[in-house]
Amino acid sequence: MGQTVTTPLSLTLEHWEDVQRTASNQSVDVKKRRWVTFCSAEWPTFGVGWPQDGTFNLDIILQVKSKVFSPGPHGHPDQVPYIVTWEAIAYEPPPWVKPFVSPKLSPSPTAPILPSGPSTQPPPRSALYPALTPSIKPGPSPIMADLSLTFSQKTLRRTEDRDRPPLTEMATEKRPPPLLRFLPPLP
């Protein structure tokens, strides 16, 4: 009568539909083969203590996540869906994971708590000052003023366009307009 050892990886594979549902809730898609590869071969090489059989330890998962999300060539964007799914399973464990997750401890204070009493220091003061903005004079905006010009006035204002032929001439030309000249001919 052989008994098998249950590991985080084997447990997730036994409940694969739940894993995929969790991934879907994270708006990602995971494949079983890559799930096994990342868990058993990739993440153990990151040097953060990830075991080949997986873990539900959030500290280790977050360290792997940090490596996966590293910018540039050190990151692993193809592994993002997988590590965020592991994290989601460990953070809000389904019933089949709960026996394998250590209870969350309330964070202990890292600095000593000072006794409360009358303070000898003056209250802190802010060095912030209100921003001074220039006053805006009411009047027509340049856009609205431009709308009042006639077509011929606008044409004259465009000095950079004076050497171009008018649109009416371009419509009667035998060659295509300037932008279409650079496109390959249609078959």
From Swiss-Prot:
Disordered: annotated segments: 107-187
Q: Where is the lipid attached (N-myristoyl glycine)?
A: 2
Q: Which domain of life is it from?
A: Viruses
Q: Where is this site: Cleavage?
A: 129-130
Q: Where is this motif: PTAP/PSAP motif?
A: 109-112
Q: The motif LYPX(n)L motif: which residues?
A: 128-132
> Biological process GO annotation list?
viral budding via host ESCRT complex
Which cellular component appears as one GO term in the record? virion component
Keyword terms of this UniProt record:
Host cell membrane, Host membrane, Host-virus interaction, Lipoprotein, Membrane, Myristate, RNA-binding, Viral budding, Viral budding via the host ESCRT complexes, Viral matrix protein, Viral release from host cell, Virion
Q: How is this chain modified after translation? A: Specific enzymatic cleavages by the viral protease yield mature proteins. The protease is released by autocatalytic cleavage. The polyprotein is cleaved during and after budding, this process is termed maturation.
Q: Which SUPFAM superfamilies does the entry mention?
A: Retroviral matrix proteins (SSF47836)
Q: Name one GO molecular function term.
A: RNA binding
- Report biased composition (Basic and acidic residues) as residue ranges: 157-176
| Record flagged with keyword Protein transport | no
Let me see what the UniProt entry remarks about domains: Late-budding domains (L domains) are short sequence motifs essential for viral particle budding. They recruit proteins of the host ESCRT machinery (Endosomal Sorting Complex Required for Transport) or ESCRT-associated proteins. Matrix protein p15 contains one L domain: a PTAP/PSAP motif, which potentially interacts with the UEV domain of TSG101. The junction between the matrix protein p15 and RNA-binding phosphoprotein p12 contains one L domain: a LYPX(n)L motif which interacts with PDCD6IP.
Q: Which PANTHER family does the record match to this protein?
A: GAG_P30 DOMAIN-CONTAINING PROTEIN
Function of the protein: Gag polyprotein plays a role in budding and is processed by the viral protease during virion maturation outside the cell. During budding, it recruits, in a PPXY-dependent or independent manner, Nedd4-like ubiquitin ligases that conjugate ubiquitin molecules to Gag, or to Gag binding host factors. Interaction with HECT ubiquitin ligases probably link the viral protein to the host ESCRT pathway and facilitate release.
Q: What is this protein called?
A: Gag polyprotein
What gene is this protein translated from? gag
